[in-house]
Amino acid sequence: MTLSAGGMVTSEYAKRYPIFTIEGGPISGIIGGIRLSSILGGKNIIVIDGGSTTTKAGLAKELTPKVYTEYWIEQDDWNAGYPLRVPTLDITEIGLGGTSLVWIDDAGNLRVGPQAAGARPGPACYGQGGDKPTLTDAYVLSGFLNPEYLLGGRLKVFKDLAHKAMSGIARQLNLDEKEASYGVVRLANDNAANLIRQISVKRGYDPREFTLIAHGGAGPMFAPFIAEELKIPEIVVPAIPSGVFNSWGMIGLDIRHELSLTDISSLKMDGAYAKYVGSRFEELESRVREMFKLEGVDPSSVVTERYLDIRYEGQAHTLKIPCYNGRLGIEHLKEAAEMFHKAHYKEYGFSLPESGMEIVGFHVVGIHKVKPPELSRISTTGSLNRASLGERTLFVDGSEFNVPIYKKESLPAGVVVEGPCIIEGDTATTVVTKNFKARHDDFGNIILTPNRR
C-alpha cells in the first residue's frame, strides 16, 4: 500500500494505521511521474491526474516533492477544509473530471463541477440513465472525443443523448449545443489551469521551468490548454495506460516508515543542547528500525533521514528542515537555523534572522530501497499512414474545422505529428493544439513541445 508521504508499507501496517495511506492513489501517480521523468532525463515536473470526478496535481522540483506534516481535505479558495496531521506529499485537487456536471448558477454563470454524475449513471452519452450534461458530453459534442472509439470502441457512446442533455444549458445561455459545449470545455480548461497555478505559482514556482506530466482520462485533454495558458514548454503523456499509471507508480516504491515526536524547546547553540537533539533523533531511529524488522526487512539496509520542525518564537506555523544525519554538534544546529531562515523567506517572503527560534518536533524517515520496474521500448516499424483514422470535425471558438486523427497504439517510435490533431488511445485521448507538435518516443510516451512555425 502507498503511504501519503510516498513510500510503501505492507497491507497489515495499512490496516493498523489507515490514516497514513490517505491520497495514496494519486500520490502514486506523482511518484510515477518522478520515475518517468528520471528515465527521460527530466528535472522539474508538475503531474496532473485528470479523472472522473476530481483532478489532482503535484509538483517535484529537482524530482524531489515536498512533504508536509499537515494535509487539508477538501480545501480550496472557498472552503477551509479539514486538517489531518499526517505526513503527505504536496498535492492539491479540485472537483473537476469527465463526469463533472454542467450547470447554471443563480447568477446565470456557467459552472462545471464540483458535483459529478460518477460512474453510475455517468455522462448522459453513456446511455446508463443519466440525463444531466457532463464534461464528457461537452467533449463529444465539440468533437474532442470520438463517440465510436471510446475505450478503443468498447464503450458505446450516444451522441444524441449528449445533445438532449446539453440542450437545456444551451437554451439558458442563448447558444446552440455546440457553442455551449465548447464553452464548457474552455471553462474546464481554465479551472484545470488554475489548479496548476495553485501547486506552482502560489508556492513560488515558475511553471515555465517545469514539464507537465498528464495522465488520467482527462489529463491529456486539459494539458495543451494549460501549457498554452501558463507557458509550460513541454508535456509528457505517459505510455503507461491512464487507468493504471498510479499503479505503475506504486510498483517499485521504496518501503518507508517514519515517526514524529512533538517536543517544544528553544533552539540553543550549545553542545549540551546539540547532544539532547541528537538523543531524540536516536530514539526515533531505533523505533523506526524496529518497524522494519517486524516486516522482515533487515534494519542494516535501512537509510534514515532526519528533519526538524522549526518556527520563530511566537509563530504558529513550522517548516520542516533537514538535519545532519550523524553525531550532532553546534555547527549542525547553526546549519539547520540558516536553512530555516532561507526556507521561511522562500515560503513567506521574509525572514527574521535576529529572532529566536523553537524546535517544535523531530521527524525521522526510514527507507529501504526497492528496484523499480523498467520501461519497454516500442517498435520503430510502421507508418503514420497506418496509424491514421481519418479526420474529425472540431468546434472551437465559434468555428468548425477538420483535424487528423491518429491511433496511438499504431504510431511507430520517433514519429512526429504537428497540431492541430488528436491522438486516440485505448484509455485516453491526447489533444494536440495548433501551437504544439507531438513526438512518439522510444517508450511510447507522447511528448508535446511548442510548434514553432
Which residue ranges define each predicted feature?
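Basic, amphipathic juxtamembrane/active-site segments
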Residues: 58-81, 235
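Conserved P-loop NTPase motor core
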Residues: 61, 68, 86, 102-105
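Conserved phosphate-binding catalytic cores of ATP/NTP-utilizing and phosphoryl-transfer enzymes
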Residues: 7-45, 72-89, 99, 108, ...
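Conserved catalytic-loop position in the HRD/HxD motif
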Residues: 49
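C-terminal, non-catalytic interaction/recognition modules in large multi-subunit enzymes and RNPs
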Residues: 42, 52, 60, 97, ...
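OB-fold/S1-family RNA-binding modules
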Residues: 100, 130
